[in-house]
Amino acid sequence: MTELKAKGPRAPHVAGGPPSPEVGSPLLCRPAAGPFPGSQTSDTLPEVSAIPISLDGLLFPRPCQGQDPSDEKTQDQQSLSDVEGAYSRAEATRGAGGSSSSPPEKDSGLLDSVLDTLLAPSGPGQSQPSPPACEVTSSWCLFGPELPEDPPAAPATQRVLSPLMSRSGCKVGDSSGTAAAHKVLPRGLSPARQLLLPASESPHWSGAPVKPSPQAAAVEVEEEDGSESEESAGPLLKGKPRALGGAAAGGGAAAVPPGAAAGGVALVPKEDSRFSAPRVALVEQDAPMAPGRSPLATTVMDFIHVPILPLNHALLAARTRQLLEDESYDGGAGAASAFAPPRSSPCASSTPVAVGDFPDCAYPPDAEPKDDAYPLYSDFQPPALKIKEEEEGAEASARSPRSYLVAGANPAAFPDFPLGPPPPLPPRATPSRPGEAAVTAAPASASVSSASSSGSTLECILYKAEGAPPQQGPFAPPPCKAPGASGCLLPRDGLPSTSASAAAAGAAPALYPALGLNGLPQLGYQAAVLKEGLPQVYPPYLNYLRPDSEASQSPQYSFESLPQKICLICGDEASGCHYGVLTCGSCKVFFKRAMEGQHNYLCAGRNDCIVDKIRRKNCPACRLRKCCQAGMVLGGRKFKKFNKVRVVRALDAVALPQPVGVPNESQALSQRFTFSPGQDIQLIPPLINLLMSIEPDVIYAGHDNTKPDTSSSLLTSLNQLGERQLLSVVKWSKSLPGFRNLHIDDQITLIQYSWMSLMVFGLGWRSYKHVSGQMLYFAPDLILNEQRMKESSFYSLCLTMWQIPQEFVKLQVSQEEFLCMKVLLLLNTIPLEGLRSQTQFEEMRSSYIRELIKAIGLRQKGVVSSSQRFYQLTKLLDNLHDLVKQLHLYCLNTFIQSRALSVEFPEMMSEVIAAQLPKILAGMVKPLLFHKK
């Protein structure tokens, strides 16, 4: 058999030698001369105790019986770099070592046990044991006895291990640090925990007297009892269990025959000797397994040739392995798979592990986490969670359809990692065993990552990362995050546990200003919007939003879609208030020339051309119409000269306050306003004028009218249009006065419950204004007449939607009434349990009901006629609930059968449908009706 070559004067291992039972202290004695290990009394059991974190006396061998005490003192004074020389001198002084050893010293004995546990090679193919340092004929090593190899597999194994062990610059017995997690660890404190505990009874020098440790004795007795219990029951396991601490079962000499293990478990040969079959598993038969102990930690992995690491790096490797195997680490199997070894490695095929002892092993059981909790792990940083990759793994079916990436360290996932000066934490119960803190912290971290309803996309659109927030007021939009933040784990809708989980994880208070309609403090924001310096991320819908820096700087409230210096006609930068409306100089001159020249402009299209900064000169007819709709009149500059002008104030004492950036009563005029010097003038209320200014522009469906209509193409085009309209609804709601004062969950919930009502209501208004209710005006490029409705597969649904424009024609609804009714539709459905900001919601809804009454009063004179009109309009709003319910049912059925029908649903729309439509159809929402049925 090929012998392994040793470096320098060291002799190779003796092939076929018996395995040594001295697992805990491989450097301190020589193997027995006979086929069986020598006897060892229980009073020579090595101590397992905490040692100080220092290099003095850690890597030095225990003197043999024939060694001179002066040599021991000389060895204690050596540095870490002279370890090899120390072992050379130890070889020269051997002679009477025998099979027994002197009582171990505390520091070196524990180190031997720890290093044997952490650095033992896992190659099952080694058939020769590793003799201790006292043996002249073998080279020193830091490992325990090797696993026995069956005779047929020995040559193949030696062929594999020989080039690895003889590689240049490496020592015999080198092992990978990652194999540390696969060794059988003693019950109780892990080696990493023991090293980090303060050494109250262990001196810093190796020559100090030894004090017995009752804890270590208890641990070893427990292991011995466990080994005896394993003899009676249990299947045959591959490999052999390790005798912990070098003690045999029962405390006496253990005769280990070649075919049996020390614990009574017979050895089973491997299936394959060429490392192609599954590896021999070294399993400790514990029934039941102690909680906090990983079953994967008992599995032997392949031999990986890595040079011997220093102590801190070895612990780092073992701790990293525990981190990757710990299920309490937020990410579970998905997070472990993201950092798992290659598929060829036996670790890749290992079973999932139980909760390990990772989070608590860095602290004493009676201490709180400190800033220097990781002094031995150099620049160790916890890897970032990749939630989206986790969702694509084995747990994707148990989680939400979609989740978003969190870059960087997440305090909700790493509750015990101090990130800067931590806030005061609640008193933590002392864990009774390693891994208990990880178990208790798992629900807190899981609540954030599993908050997977569809509200995150809407929340990302509602709140965008900005610079310094503007001056806040009662209706000011709250800033989403502090400057410098880079990403955000956004919580999903309807999970009140999110804030609690972040508080339990020790996260800093969230950034959400205390806003209220009447100065009342606003409810706390979700814990997802984190402090400055923590990650935040948003999906690609942000280009639809306007930054908060462009918002109005009003001391009362500001609106992101109505900056103070934006032209209300084309969107260019406004130069002032011209002819009663805030416009740019170009639109001012155009309106003056068009009105004074009395031009008869005609639109070449359908009177719905887009008027913006680039295309404002394309169609003068549509531009002039938009000027008139905004309230521009030539006599607007001469209002102060008329004595009989009576201004109707828009808001009473209980209504919403007026912003500074909104034109006042003497500036905003009604559409197509004409007057004479002796005529009373009534002006549009400022809030109504504001609702006109934030009304979304025309949205196109992108439908190809050159191709024949098919059911799938029409439905796909409608879904694309619905996605764009949903984004438009979110942007519109951000600019709505009072809406941003509601809790973020309430905002998302209201949009999700009312988006279908808002879309069909807008469809009815466009059909009423553009085609007089004769067709369904979905978009300028998607207009369905009755013939196209009949050819589609949803003709009955089209007839249902057609009722709305017909009601508009019957009632002759004005634009002011439509705008107020549209806001009330946003506020007409709430959850059964109510909203978090229920008081602010009710005040906001009451304010817009009053605005609807004022809009009715602009056309209806008298109390009776106004009351009748109010009844008709509110009755129409109540009837929309039943109509929209039919649309919800059809939409959900189409979404479920989308693959069979070849219909595409966009991402954001799919999330809202999957998350909220089942709730609405199941009656889990409360419609707000004006009249009893």
UniProtKB/Swiss-Prot annotation:
There is a cross-link at K7, K388, K531 (Glycyl lysine isopeptide (Lys-Gly) (interchain with G-Cter in SUMO)). InterPro entries: NHR-like_dom_sf, Nucl_hrmn_rcpt_lig-bd, Nuclear_hormone_rcpt_NR3, Nuclear_hrmn_rcpt, Progest_rcpt, Znf_hrmn_rcpt, Znf_NHR/GATA. Residues 456-546 are annotated as: AF1. Residues 1-157, 195-241, 331-351, 415-452 are annotated as: Disordered. Residues 220-231 have a biased composition (Acidic residues). A motif (Nuclear localization signal) lies at residues 183-187. Keywords: Cytoplasm, DNA-binding, Isopeptide bond, Lipid-binding, Lipoprotein, Membrane, Metal-binding, Mitochondrion, Mitochondrion outer membrane, Nucleus, Palmitate, Phosphoprotein, Receptor, Steroid-binding, Transcription, Transcription regulation, Ubl conjugation, Zinc, Zinc-finger. Interacts with SMARD1 and UNC45A. Interacts with CUEDC2; the interaction promotes ubiquitination, decreases sumoylation, and represses transcriptional activity. Interacts with PIAS3; the interaction promotes sumoylation of PR in a hormone-dependent manner, inhibits DNA-binding, and alters nuclear export. Interacts with SP1; the interaction requires ligand-induced phosphorylation on Ser-345 by ERK1/2 MAPK. Interacts with PRMT2. Isoform A interacts with NCOR2. Isoform B (but not isoform A) interacts with NCOA2 and NCOA1. Isoform B (but not isoform A) interacts with KLF9. Interacts with GTF2B. Pfam families: Hormone_recep, Prog_receptor, zf-C4. A zinc finger (NR C4-type) spans 567-587, 603-627. Changing W140 to A/F/R: Reduces transcriptional activation. Residues 1-164 are annotated as: AF3. Changing L55A: Reduces transcriptional activation. Composed of three domains: a modulating N-terminal domain, a DNA-binding domain and a C-terminal ligand-binding domain. Phosphorylated on multiple serine sites. Several of these sites are hormone-dependent. Phosphorylation on Ser-294 occurs preferentially on isoform B, is highly hormone-dependent and modulates ubiquitination and sumoylation on Lys-388. Phosphorylation on Ser-102 and Ser-345 also requires induction by hormone. Basal phosphorylation on Ser-81, Ser-162, Ser-190 and Ser-400 is increased in response to progesterone and can be phosphorylated in vitro by the CDK2-A1 complex. Increased levels of phosphorylation on Ser-400 also in the presence of EGF, heregulin, IGF, PMA and FBS. Sumoylation is hormone-dependent and represses transcriptional activity. Sumoylation on all three sites is enhanced by PIAS3. Desumoylated by SENP1. Sumoylation on Lys-388, the main site of sumoylation, is repressed by ubiquitination on the same site, and modulated by phosphorylation at Ser-294. This is Progesterone receptor. Residues 567-639 bind DNA. The lineage of its organism: Eukaryota, Metazoa, Chordata, Craniata, Vertebrata. Residues 232-241, 335-350, 430-452 have a biased composition (Low complexity). Residues 1-566 are annotated as: Modulating, Pro-Rich. A motif (LXXL motif 2) lies at residues 115-119. A motif (LXXL motif 1) lies at residues 55-59. Changing K531R: Some loss of sumoylation. Completely abolishes sumoylation.
